[in-house]
Amino acid sequence: MAKATKPADLRAKTAEELEALLIDLKREQFNLRFQRATGQNEGQARVRTVRREIARVKTIASQALKKNAVGAGAPAAKS
């Protein structure tokens, strides 16, 4: 992932797509941590960007979950 993903783009994704993106980001974060530990990492900025991307994806997923829970748990309108 070369560029930071915009929140609007993330909101358009399904829960499965967000989960897949989160897995990819966590895998990249692991690889960057491993590179840093072995002294191969030259770009520290990418570590920070990936960490923020993970937080962004988790936030959007949490908001979507809460939005769906509130909508499903609302009582039906009385006639």
From Swiss-Prot:
GO BP terms: translation
Keywords: Ribonucleoprotein, Ribosomal protein
Bridged cysteine pairs (disulfide): none
InterPro entries: Ribosomal_protein_uL29, Ribosomal_uL29, Ribosomal_uL29_sf
Pfam family, one: Ribosomal_L29
GO MF annotations in UniProt: structural constituent of ribosome
Domain of life: Bacteria
Record's keyword annotation contains Ribonucleoprotein: yes
TM ranges: none
GO annotation, cellular component aspect: cytosolic large ribosomal subunit
Homology family: Belongs to the universal ribosomal protein uL29 family.
NCBIfam families: L29
HAMAP family in the record: Ribosomal_uL29
Name the record gives this protein: Large ribosomal subunit protein uL29
Organism per entry: Gluconacetobacter diazotrophicus (strain ATCC 49037 / DSM 5601 / CCUG 37298 / CIP 103539 / LMG 7603 / PAl5)
